[in-house]
Amino acid sequence: MVEKQIAARGIQDPRVLEAMGKVPRERFVSEHIAPLAYEDRPLSIDEGQTISQPFIVAVMAQQAQITPQDKVLEIGTGSGYSAAILSQLASHVYSMERYPKLAELAKKRLQEFGYNNVTVSVGDGSLGWEEFAPYEVIIVTAGGPQIPPSLLKQLAISGRLVIPVGPSLESQQLMRVMREDADHYRYENLGSVQFVPLVGKEGWQTTSSS
């Protein structure tokens, strides 16, 4: 999977490629869809959510430029697969999930497979996780109508935020935001994507958005 679906499509960061090769995606989906785990596409999980396609996980990780010293905030734990990838790249990953059922299952999987530098909690991801801020990296695996102000505030100086944003679920752009100093941010459009909605106080108000 790594060579054909990820490296061949432009992912060059050796640490990202190594992490993708180490994490068994089939362990993060239901048994009945495990045979599809290494296809490069999203797969359905509980609560109407999805596990992102491997290539998109790799793109977001590479664009975040994660170092071994970085503290990472992930918004949208989902199955725990992306958190497992990020845990191979960072010092610690704090992952916020809206759905308690998904959070508990992800926490169980991550602990079972030895990803001990991941902390999972339940809450409104659009508000971030202020307790452990600032973060060198914030990665958001759900798309909102705007970049949540709370996430910008919790980004460290020189930090990187990777987030899908758009006026509807059918029209999203993957954005990279770099915090240059206390008051200035630099924005870069990385291209079109499609993610589940970021629901919360600073995101969409419902799971269906038009």
Swiss-Prot record:
Catalytic site positions: S52
Gene3D superfamilies in the cross-refs: Vaccinia Virus protein VP39
Alphabetically ordered keywords of this record: Cytoplasm, Methyltransferase, S-adenosyl-L-methionine, Transferase
Compartments it resides in: Cytoplasm
E.C. number(s) listed in UniProt: 2.1.1.77
Keyword Cell wall biogenesis/degradation listed: no
Pfam families xref list: PCMT
UniProt GO molecular function: protein-L-isoaspartate (D-aspartate) O-methyltransferase activity
Gene Ontology biological process terms in this record: methylation; protein modification process; protein repair
Cellular component GO terms, alphabetical: cytoplasm
Catalytic function, reaction form: [protein]-L-isoaspartate + S-adenosyl-L-methionine = [protein]-L-isoaspartate alpha-methyl ester + S-adenosyl-L-homocysteine
Keyword Iron-sulfur: no
Role: Catalyzes the methyl esterification of L-isoaspartyl residues in peptides and proteins that result from spontaneous decomposition of normal L-aspartyl and L-asparaginyl residues. It plays a role in the repair and/or degradation of damaged proteins.
Family: Belongs to the methyltransferase superfamily. L-isoaspartyl/D-aspartyl protein methyltransferase family.
Name recorded for this polypeptide: Protein-L-isoaspartate O-methyltransferase
Taxonomic lineage from the root: Bacteria, Pseudomonadati, Chlamydiota, Chlamydiia, Parachlamydiales
Name of encoding gene: pcm
